[in-house]
Curated annotation (Swiss-Prot):
GO cellular component: cytosol
Gene symbol of the encoding locus: tgt
Annotated stretches, region: RNA binding: 251-257, 275-279
Gene3D superfamilies: Queuine tRNA-ribosyltransferase-like (3.20.20.105)
Residues annotated as binding Zn(2+): C308, C310, C313, H339
Protein known as: Queuine tRNA-ribosyltransferase
Organism: Streptococcus pyogenes serotype M5 (strain Manfredo)
Length: 380
């Protein structure tokens, strides 16, 4: 049996759904699952210190291979002692492969069997990223969990294109495994693609499971498809993945999508959503989203969320936070970002308890009713 640096321990499966309560053991510690991972694109979660992230309960954070490769450079980070030391974070780190960022540069990239040529978004220079290079960068960064280099096809691309894409992604995954220099202390995940086509998702999953990765990611979702389409893909994809290994749904952070992903057997999630909307003054609360810059909050001296015990809600009012944001004070963004991150991390804590109590479906219904979801208006 392979001795992986990343191990998944299943504690309990919820009686009425596919939801899993577990934990993931890494070289830099263990974190409970299901878990939402804050995104620290540039080796920092925007406006938050490592101490604040620990107070929030973030057991693991994500950093971005593409951005750190361009600036300050993976070799510089390696010389500093690795990403953990560079950013003063002693808990687990996951790095993506850079594939999604390259995918997002659709107008300036060229995909071949060897890899992807694209324009550096900082200075316009030509860059080349291959499966081997993506692994080399992540080996230099020293993250606990790494991603294979993949192509993320658009959800509605033609069948023939997606078929060729997943076959290439499988070949890239095999090349990445061979290039991996640190399998003893860095766990490499394979990424299942296939857009909305069930047979292609099956083919992609079968290819990757045969390669025996320590964990598996589900990619190519949250890229413009409907919530119902995402759930349908998860319904037929997660059962294809090994029960004894972690399952990671990439780029998902809306509360209803998190809960629905957990119901379908997903263990890990990440998204820039909580910090991105916080910078615009949008806050997640137990009763729905709150746009704090609105004039009606100018003299509202209550917390952002009456049911939240985070640092922001325990110490500051809506009126004060609105004032900070209207005055372009960074502290306002820090407070809203802290609250939104806490909200999602704490939501996952409540979800874990609901799995333990075998009442996740009831929890989902109660949460969504309070939050104000309906099909015509999916608030964050």
């Amino acid at each position: 049996m392979t001795d992986y640096p990343i191990k998944y321990r299943l504690i309990k499966t919820e009686k009425h759904t596919g939801a899993r309560l577990g934990e993931i053991i890494t070289p830099h510690g263990t974190f409970p699952t299901p878990m939402f991972m804050p995104v620290g694109t540039q080796a920092t979660v925007k406006t938050q210190s490592p101490e604040e992230l620990k107070a929030i309960g973030s057991g693991i954070i994500l950093s971005n291979t593409y951005h750190l490769w361009l600036r300050p450079g993976d070799e510089l980070i390696a010389r500093s002692g690795g990403l953990h030391k560079f950013m003063n974070w002693d808990q687990p780190i996951l790095t993506d492969s850079g594939g999604f960022q390259v995918y997002s540069l659709a107008d300036s990239r060229n995909i071949t069997e060897e890899g992807v040529t694209f324009k550096n978004h900082l200075n316009g220079s030509k860059m080349f990223l291959s499966p081997e290079k993506a692994i080399s960068i992540q080996n230099n960064l020293g993250s606990d969990i790494m991603m294979s280099f993949d192509e993320c096809p658009q959800f509605y691309q033609p069948y023939d294109y997606v078929k060729k894409s997943i076959e290439r992604t499988s070949r890239w995954a095999e090349r990445g495994l061979k290039a991996h220099r640190r399998p003893h202390d860095q766990g490499l995940f394979g990424i299942v693609q296939g857009a909305g086509f069930e047979d292609l998702r099956r083919q992609s999953a079968a290819d990757l499971v045969a390669m025996d990765f320590p964990g598996y990611s589900i990619g190519g979702l949250a890229v413009g498809e409907s919530h119902e389409e995402m759930n349908a893909v998860l319904d037929f994809t997660t059962p294809l993945l090994p029960e004894n290994k972690p399952r990671y749904l990439m780029g998902v952070g809306a509360p209803d999508s998190l809960i629905d992903g957990v119901i379908r057997g997903v263990d890990m999630f990440d998204c820039v959503l909580p910090t991105r909307i916080a910078r615009n003054g949008t806050c997640m609360t137990s009763e729905g989203r709150l746009v704090i810059k609105n004039a009606k909050f100018a003299e509202d001296f209550t917390p952002l969320d009456h049911d939240c015990d985070c640092y922001t809600c325990q110490n500051y009012s809506r009126a004060y936070i609105r004032h900070l944001l209207k005055a372009d004070e960074t502290f306002g963004i820090r407070l809203t970002s802290y609250h939104n991150l806490y909200f999602l991390v704490n939501l996952m804590k409540k979800v874990r308890q609901a799995i333990m109590d075998d009442n996740l479906l009831e929890f989902r219904q109660d949460f969504l009713e309070r939050y104000g979801y309906n099909k015509s208006n999916r608030n964050f």
